Amino acid sequence: MNILVLGSGGREHAIIKSMSKSEKSSTIYALPGNGGTSLLAKNISGDVNDFDLIKKVVVEKNISMVFVGPEDPIVKGIYDYFKLDTELSKVKIIAPSKLAGSLEGSKDFAKNFMKKYNIPTARHKTFTAENINQADSFLESMTPPYVLKADGLAAGKGVLILQDLTEAKKELRSMIIDKKFGKSSSKVVIEEFLEGIELSCFVLTDGHSYKTLPFAKDYKKIGEGDTGLNTEEWEQYLLSHF
């Protein structure tokens, strides 16, 4: 089958590298891809959020399966776009629906989802410009470090962990009032800091059954010794000893 992988990062390169080993793959395309993917697939210039362009590529290249790497097109509803288009509805697309993508696209949505279904999570509250003074009071009720999370997507950089209360209040205003992360931080989730190891659990599902993949740990900090701001992720290890 002909496969289209959307994205331009190391994640997409790793996905294409694995797909290229399968006997089921004929030609693999990457949109837009990168230097590494060009060695394994055919790169196509374009924006992963240009759904009409993606449709054109899928039709012209006789694509049977689309794998969506980045979060942005998922949150904007690329799965729904395919399923509602008669020319694309039978193309296999590996991505969640727009509603399911809200778990990644909105931290406030995710927190409310966890509360509704009794999934353990840190103590938290969501604030906007309208109730920012209440946010100050909530911060004062907590012990450091203080965790501020932009509600929307921010390329992995929207979470701040701060030790100082005054700095936390300052950064809160920078996020909400000054739009430090654009529209993504017009709403901010303040939550309790949890000590421990962060792990990612991956599950593939078709809506009827599911298959779990190995756990992994991200190393997101940009600086040496796990310091500095978060990135989308520098590297990731599969972990068995946890």
Question: Which ranges hold each PLM region?
Answer:
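Short, charged, surface-exposed secondary-structure boundary motifs
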Residues: 38-41, 102-108, 223-225
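A conserved helix-loop-beta module that forms one wall/lid of the active-site cleft
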Residues: 88-158
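ATP-binding N-terminal substructure of ATP-dependent carboxylate-amine bond-forming enzymes
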Residues: 1-96
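Short acidic-hydrophobic, aromatic-tinged amphipathic segments that line or gate anion-handling sites
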Residues: 43-49, 125-131, 162
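Internal nucleotide-binding/catalytic subdomain
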Residues: 162-242
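A general structural signal for well-ordered alpha-helical segments in protein cores
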Residues: 12, 51-54, 75, 79, ...
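CheY-like receiver
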Residues: 57, 137-138, 171
